[in-house]
Amino acid sequence: MSVQEDGAARPEPDVLRRHDSLYGDAEKVSNNKRHGAGGSWARTLQLAFQSIGVVYGDVGTSPLYVYSSTFPNGIKHPDDLVGVLSLILYTLILIPMVKYVFIVLYANDNGDGGTFALYSLISRHAKIRMIPNDQTEDANVSNYSIEAPSSQLRRAEWVKQKLESSNAAKIALFTITILGTSMVMGDGTLTPAISVLSAVSGIREKAPNLTQSQVVWISVAILFVLFSMQRFGTDKVGYTFAPVISVWFLLIAGIGMYNLTVHEITILRAFNPKYIVDYFRRNGKEAWVSLGGVVLCITGTEAMFADLGHFNIRAIQLSFTCVLFPSVALCYMGQAAYLRKFPENVGDTFYRSIPAPLFWPVFVVAIMGAIIASQAMLSGAFAILSKALSLGCFPRVEVVHTSNKYEGQVYIPEVNFLIGAASVAVTLAFQTTANIGNAYGICVVTVFSITTHLMTVVMLLIWKVRLPFIAAFYAAFGLAEFLYLSSILSKFAEGGYLPFCFSLVLMALMATWHYVHVKRYWYELDRVVPAAETTALLARRDVRRVPGVGLLYSELVQGIPPVFPRLVDKIPSVHAVFVFMSIKHLPVPRVAPAERFIFRRVVGADAGAGHRLFRCVARYGYTDQLEGAKEFAAFLLDRLKVFVHEESVFACSRGDNDDDDAMRRAQAMAEEEKRVIDAEAERGVVYLMGEANVTAAAGSSVMKRIVVNYVYTLLRKNLREGHKALSVPKDQLLKVGITYEI
């Protein structure tokens, strides 16, 4: 039986749709087990320990610079310390603990977190992606589980309808998502700079002759080593992260208890929030400005959510409440107690408050902790960009998977070079942690605010929470983050401009790439080749059937791409087995190999002059790794034979079940076709790719011509080529040039 495809997407009977899928019972595949999803308490404790090294390096090293950034001009009143300590404690409780640990972590996408995970979660419940490549079979992927809005809660259905019908809403959600990604990239630039510089600055306590410039160059040397080692990944040294950060937490907690006992235990009254009110009454605008330093105590909080895929919710909740919060709270309280007696040392509080015998051990662990914090932030930045790349939101770059044991550990050489150069430049330009902190805070709070807005959509659309709770969530966290952001923006001219400029450039690149990507897809979709024209092309006298298997890649998941007629015109030959191949990334973290492919027959041997034409969509999640070309082709052809077999079984089941001769003929034809596929595979596989030159159509605006003809073209020519991303051997590659005017 031959299922013809007329080029345009058309509704199909349910039974036919089921048959057209490669795996008839894909919906029966059990949901993939996430790493650390559930399990025994022993396993949870193990994951909680491991998470200490991966998740908390950044927030755990914040005590190195929070007080110096909060009081850049010194402490004017002794009780200001109590007010700031109270702000620090309640900021730690409100945002990392209440918001992230006990609310946001539950909005994960099959165990994965982060800004893109929230966006993909929303996009599965409402069609907000701008590329129309949704297919009915996608819902059968086990990780694609969704809960339709309840009929009892019309609000969720109303929100869904508004999101799907409003281009402005789609663009707004996409914009804040790429803004969050851009800010995380800024975070990846500033975290190494501020963490390493603040840790190295402590050496001046024992070597006072060192100038600040020399400290900066020592920091630059460490940064150079850090970024040079990224290509090796964290797999080989990752096992040391948790012990080192655990030792760090024990040290800062112990030193904090020591300072509390020796200097002023009464600083514990900071748990009374009235001291926050007194602090603002006493200092007014200066107290508001100081919030930009206070917020640095929660840098790295987003990592708890972004790195969720490697752990589980219980593990992170346990490690935060039992290890991180007590340790850093004791550290901040101890520093405040020390500063009550020695307020003149606020510029270097951390190292001045360390008992003399512990200085060198703490200094060494601080350097290691700063490097680990930087490494964790960089790994997270690479992972987020990898997700953006798979969803068509970032230009093609090389993604190197650095671990065979742990998924999600990737390294992107081009991005590593740019972030490394930017981090070194920031360190050399700003010189002090106080100046870098002005820029750092903007990245941190902007990501917090974006998560709050996306979480509000999740609550409305997916969780279907009662409105009073949603209003309370948005008001509490939205107001707090607005206050912090407004404070940081007051330092725009003192370094706050840096992440804005960085993010604007990165957003412009991402938006340009995605805009042309969408326009190109629509251009191809509007010009799909009808099945009748395909059959006519194959029937031409000058078109020869050549041995082997041809895989023609395009982004279309429905219809024959317009590059095919051009290929036949230029090279009047078609392979005996020809597959129109599409690589599609679903808004889910992973797709099981058993659910990878969807096949449809385009033209059978009887109608195609001996050619066998198929369409295939290979589906991947945004954390999945593409196989090498050889392995991919072998797996593809193996599953193609399964499809041929299932097609014959389905054809027999629709006919007269008593006609044994017909069944035998159908089975014999299927066996013959499988033999043909094997024989042609032995003759070799050729990969064909359309090399599209995209230009702005005549009459386009000046801005569109600049974006398409210059910016996009520059990106496309200077970044990774498509065949390299698919690991296609050059001796098996054939490119077909074509021009699209969009």
From Swiss-Prot:
Q: Name the UniProt key words of this record, in alphabetical order.
A: Glycoprotein, Ion transport, Membrane, Potassium, Potassium transport, Transmembrane, Transmembrane helix, Transport
Q: In terms of one coarse class, where is the protein primarily found?
A: membrane
Q: Which Pfam families match?
A: K_trans, K_trans_C
* Ion transport listed as a keyword: yes
Q: Which GO terms describe its molecular function?
A: potassium ion transmembrane transporter activity
Q: Mind telling me which residue stretches traverse the membrane in this protein? A: 47-67, 84-104, 171-191, 207-227, 237-257, 288-308, 318-338, 353-373, 410-430, 442-462, 469-489, 496-516
Point out the glycosylated residues in this chain. Answer: N259
* Locations listed in the record: Membrane
Topology versus the membrane = Multi-pass membrane protein
Which sequence ranges are listed under topological domain Cytoplasmic?
1-46, 105-170, 228-236, 309-317, 374-409, 463-468, 517-742
Record InterPro entries: K+_transporter, K_trans_C, K_trans_N
Gene Ontology cellular component annotations, sorted alphabetically: membrane
PANTHER family registered for this protein in UniProt: OSMOTIC STRESS POTASSIUM TRANSPORTER, POTASSIUM TRANSPORTER 19
- What is the protein's known function? High-affinity potassium transporter.
Q: What's the protein called, per UniProt?
A: Potassium transporter 19
Gene coding for it: HAK19
